[in-house]
């Protein structure tokens, strides 16, 4: 029995954010690929290529710190997730926000650091 693409998309749409993140990680591991956009490959295409300054950043939670409750509240404030999703993301670590400006990334980093968490801006 073979699933159609529509059935696969519908099944993914029913999953929570954490389940989808776990699915992406499993696909990356199984097939040896990365879900990250290949931005650097275009810039390194030739010597005449102009190096562009990064305009979009990703904020990644690397460590929630000692006070998880404060970190969960901060994650909820930053992401707009519900309590359970924010708790799961805080405990597992991972991407808080993608495609944000440098100013917003720094604001998120400051807010999370004040909550005792460690974040990385990529």
Curated annotation (Swiss-Prot):
Instruction: List the Gene Ontology MF annotations in alphabetical order.
Output: mRNA binding; structural constituent of ribosome
Keyword Cell membrane set for record: no
Q: Matching InterPro entries, A to Z?
A: Ribosomal_bL12, Ribosomal_bL12_C, Ribosomal_bL12_C/ClpS-like, Ribosomal_bL12_oligo, Ribosomal_bL12_oligo_N_sf
Question: Gene Ontology cellular component?
Answer: cytosolic large ribosomal subunit
- Write out the coiled-coil annotation as residue ranges: none
- Fetch the CDD domains from UniProt: Ribosomal_L7_L12
Q: Name one Pfam family in it.
A: Ribosomal_L12_N
Q: A single GO BP annotation from the record? A: translation
Key words, A-Z: Ribonucleoprotein, Ribosomal protein
**Role summary:** Forms part of the ribosomal stalk which helps the ribosome interact with GTP-bound translation factors. Is thus essential for accurate translation.
Q: Which family, according to the similarity comment? A: Belongs to the bacterial ribosomal protein bL12 family.
- NCBIfam families per record: L12 (TIGR00855)
Q: How does it assemble?
A: Homodimer. Part of the ribosomal stalk of the 50S ribosomal subunit. Forms a multimeric L10(L12)X complex, where L10 forms an elongated spine to which 2 to 4 L12 dimers bind in a sequential fashion. Binds GTP-bound translation factors.
- Name of the featured protein: Large ribosomal subunit protein bL12
Q: Give the organism, scientific name.
A: Xanthomonas oryzae pv. oryzae (strain KACC10331 / KXO85)
């Amino acid at each position: 029995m073979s699933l159609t693409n529509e059935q696969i998309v519908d099944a993914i749409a029913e999953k929570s954010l954490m389940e989808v993140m776990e699915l992406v990680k499993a696909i990356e591991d199984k097939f040896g690929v990365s879900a990250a956009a290949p931005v650097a490959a275009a810039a390194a295409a030739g010597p005449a290529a102009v190096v562009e300054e990064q305009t979009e950043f990703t904020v990644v939670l690397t460590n929630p710190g000692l006070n998880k409750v404060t970190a969960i509240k901060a994650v909820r404030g930053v992401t707009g997730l519900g309590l359970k999703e924010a708790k799961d993301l805080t405990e597992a670590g991972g991407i808080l926000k993608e495609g944000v400006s440098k100013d917003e990334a720094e604001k998120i980093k400051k807010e999370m650091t004040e909550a005792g968490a460690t974040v990385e801006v990529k």
